[in-house]
């Protein structure tokens, strides 16, 4: 069957699923890391499952009922997700009101088999919109449900879980933890194998040293008084197109041949691919040699920051920024760019630098209208653990982020499996980057 021809033949009415039992009421503050203007949107995700019979756990007669019940039970533990974001009277900050109102759940059916979606399904997950709830404006997060789930039943007995979650509540690792809680309970566990921890106070800003604050104010003045000439900022959103590329193990070997000998044994796939993409993107966009270009990468604070407790599901990704002129980036070697990426990663792994980045966030929150020009944002989510989504009576065969669009323009790097079962790297970029220095197989 051609994928273009499939359609969701039935979609039920959206319903609110509340926690299965009474949960605490009250207000929970967000961290300064959560309450970032750039995180005020609903992040989509797709997970594809094939029905299996393992002999011990047979598929329920109505998988949708089992998932709905598991969702309600998971919300007993993750009860803030069943609440609503409210804006506080002062400063425009957000907080979660734990109201127990619930999350949105939809059941649907599609006239298609799991193998018709790809063996296995790979981005761009064509037809992805059919597997996701209609959330309206994904950039509006106040006063609305914080989580949406659609289960689409397929002809073969498999199904697709399409979700949206408010990024202010959880990052990729936290979202996976919540999904795993639902899956654990659907598998038959009495409770999630990892119990959630809120504790957003771990990422609260302290006072800034005067010299740092002064430097930041100068940067704001410079950005506010500069006329924007970056096509990636001025181009209308409707003209932006998401593009996904896959990198096989053979492709990575080819890329590594361009790495200096002293780095070949230690460079990570993230460092290498990020360096290649940043350089290629900069060249493709035609920036002037004297202009400053920036790279923003993500560093996971888990395991590094004040011993974050097991079960913490809030935002824990910090984003150092590298600045360099176009000339210096493009005329120096690939090894030089890799060293820049590596240096930024390692410098951000100190508690002092992590705290400084959190301390700067309130200043940026006061100026949400400021757009940083010529910046490439990339995020490594290869190892968040999606393969651990084990329902028992259904096996996850693929999934990931289906679309990337405004307000989120991040280039995500994540892992999938190809038709041979081998792991391949998937990355996203915009349609402006069409001329990579190496031929990369495009799916």
Swiss-Prot record:
The active site is at 167 (proton acceptor), 390 (proton acceptor). It is an enzyme of class 2 (transferase). The keyword Transferase applies. Its EC number is 2.3.1.-. InterPro entries: CAT-like_dom_sf (IPR023213), Plant_acyltransferase (IPR050898). The keyword Lipoprotein does not apply. GO terms for molecular function: hydroxycinnamoyltransferase activity. Keywords: Acyltransferase, Transferase. Pfam families: Transferase. Coiled coil: none annotated. Hydroxycinnamoyl transferase that catalyzes the transfer of an acyl from p-coumaryol-CoA to spermidine, to produce coumaroyl spermidine. Can use feruloyl-CoA as acyl donor. Contributes to the natural variation of spermidine-based phenolamides in rice cultivars. PANTHER family: ACYL TRANSFERASE 4, OS10G0105900 PROTEIN. Belongs to the plant acyltransferase family. This is Spermidine hydroxycinnamoyltransferase 1. The lineage of its organism: Eukaryota, Viridiplantae, Streptophyta, Embryophyta, Tracheophyta.
């Amino acid at each position: 069957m051609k994928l273009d021809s499939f359609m969701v033949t039935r979609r039920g009415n959206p319903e609110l699923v509340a926690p299965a039992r009474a949960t605490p009421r009250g207000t929970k503050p967000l961290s300064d890391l959560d309450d970032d203007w750039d995180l005020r949107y609903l992040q989509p995700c797709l997970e594809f499952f094939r029905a299996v019979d393992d002999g011990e756990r047979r598929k329920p007669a109505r998988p949708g009922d089992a998932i709905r019940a598991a969702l309600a039970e998971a919300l007993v533990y993750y009860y803030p997700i069943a609440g609503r974001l409210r804006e506080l009277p002062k400063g425009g900050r957000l907080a979660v009101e734990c109201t127990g109102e619930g999350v949105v759940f939809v059941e649907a059916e599609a006239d298609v088999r799991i193998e018709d979606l790809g063996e296995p399904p790979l981005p761009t997950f064509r037809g992805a919109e059919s597997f996701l709830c209609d959330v309206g404006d994904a950039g509006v997060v106040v006063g609305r449900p914080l989580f949406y789930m659609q289960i689409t039943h397929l002809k073969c007995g498999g199904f697709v879980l399409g979700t949206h979650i408010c990024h202010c509540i959880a990052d990729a690792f936290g979202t996976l933890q919540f999904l795993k809680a639902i899956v654990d309970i659907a598998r038959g566990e009495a409770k999630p194998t990892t119990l959630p921890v809120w504790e957003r106070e771990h990422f609260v800003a302290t006072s800034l040293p005067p010299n740092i604050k002064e430097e930041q104010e100068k940067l704001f003045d410079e950005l506010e008084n500069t006329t924007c000439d970056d096509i990636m900022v001025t181009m209308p959103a409707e003209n932006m197109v998401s593009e996904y590329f896959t990198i096989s193990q053979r492709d990575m070997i080819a890329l590594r041949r361009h790495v200096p000998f002293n780095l070949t044994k230690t460079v990570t796939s993230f460092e290498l691919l990020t360096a290649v993409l940043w350089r290629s993107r900069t060249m493709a966009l035609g920036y002037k040699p004297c202009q400053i270009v920036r790279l923003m990468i993500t560093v996971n604070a888990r395991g590094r920051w004040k011993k974050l407790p097991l079960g913490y599901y809030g935002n824990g990704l910090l984003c150092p920024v590298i600045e360099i002129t176009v000339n210096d980036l493009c005329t120096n070697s690939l090894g030089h760019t890799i060293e820049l990426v590596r240096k930024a990663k390692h410098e951000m792994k100190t508690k002092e630098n992590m705290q400084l980045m959190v301390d700067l966030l309130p200043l940026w929150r006061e100026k949400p209208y400021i757009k940083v020009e010529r910046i490439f944002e990339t995020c490594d989510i290869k190892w968040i653990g999606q393969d651990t989504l084990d329902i028992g009576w259904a096996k996850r065969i693929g999934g990931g982020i289906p679309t990337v669009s405004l307000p989120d323009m991040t280039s995500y790097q994540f892992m999938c499996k190809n038709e041979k079962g081998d792991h391949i790297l998937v990355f996203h970029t915009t349609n402006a980057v069409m001329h990579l220095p190496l031929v990369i197989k495009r799916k």
